[in-house]
Amino acid sequence: MKKEKLRTENISFQYPGAATYALKDVSFSLFEGEWVSVIGQNGSGKSTLAKLLNGLFLPEAGTITVNDTMILSEETVWDVRKQIGMVFQNPDNQFVGTTVQDDVVFGLENIGMPREQMVERLNQALRLVRMEDFLNDEPHSLSGGQKQRVAIAGVLALQPSILILDEATSMLDPQGRREVVETVRQLVNEKGITVLSITHDLEEAAQSDRVIILNKGEILEEGIPEQIFKSSHMLQEIGLDVPFSVKIAELLKRNEILLQNTHLTMESLVNELWRLHSKK
């Protein structure tokens, strides 16, 4: 059985002066080597959840437990932050070094890591995100996707238990988004890294292992992507779209082209259409 890395139990939070709760009675677990996406329209509570998990705010009720032992509180917040690494949406705002290597080792220098160990962590982190050939490049010379991969490397160098992506692909072009999503999938599959992705991009969420839908501060639904995106009517009712491949598949079914599976990518959909055509 996989080890539980993060658990929220009945957490609630209300901003001062607000009439309603931003989060209400939210409970879920995150397991080792799992990629979970949290989706929801604006105002659903996604950003508030990210702030709570990183200890920027503390829940008014309920608990957040990391690695099955550490409960988030004012006393433990700095220890929790060592276990949870965050990558934010604007890659340009995350660079603090003049080169890729300067940026990745910045956090390591701050904790006084010996140089030999720091170089080892630097090279390992850049290899994980396939940016080892850009060691001495300046940030302005990189694409958006490359910048986010360097930001991920900077977090991985600190070896947190959990990687949280807070709208990390929202400001990227399609190619940049693909680069980041492919990197995340590789980190999960090959290295067993645990990822929580807070996103409005349903194409990205469709690639994860599990999806949590937040609506008005509460968990509306939770399940594997195939299960979640079957309920396209429910998603549209709360202001969310569905992946393009799901839309196309639904149109085909209305035209009596019966498909066996829920297709979360165009590649998967095209492959089944090709098989159907080959049988004729």
Curated annotation (Swiss-Prot):
One of its GO terms (cellular component) is ATP-binding cassette (ABC) transporter complex. InterPro entries: AAA+_ATPase (IPR003593), ABC_transporter-like_ATP-bd (IPR003439), ABC_transporter-like_CS (IPR017871), ABC_transpr_CbiO/EcfA_su (IPR015856), ECF_ABC_transporter_ATP-bd (IPR050095), EcfA_1 (IPR030947), P-loop_NTPase (IPR027417). Disulfide bonds: none annotated. Keywords: ATP-binding, Cell membrane, Membrane, Nucleotide-binding, Translocase, Transport. CDD domains: ABC_cobalt_CbiO_domain1 (cd03225). Forms a stable energy-coupling factor (ECF) transporter complex composed of 2 membrane-embedded substrate-binding proteins (S component), 2 ATP-binding proteins (A component) and 2 transmembrane proteins (T component). This is Energy-coupling factor transporter ATP-binding protein EcfA1. It comes from Bacillus cereus (strain ZK / E33L).
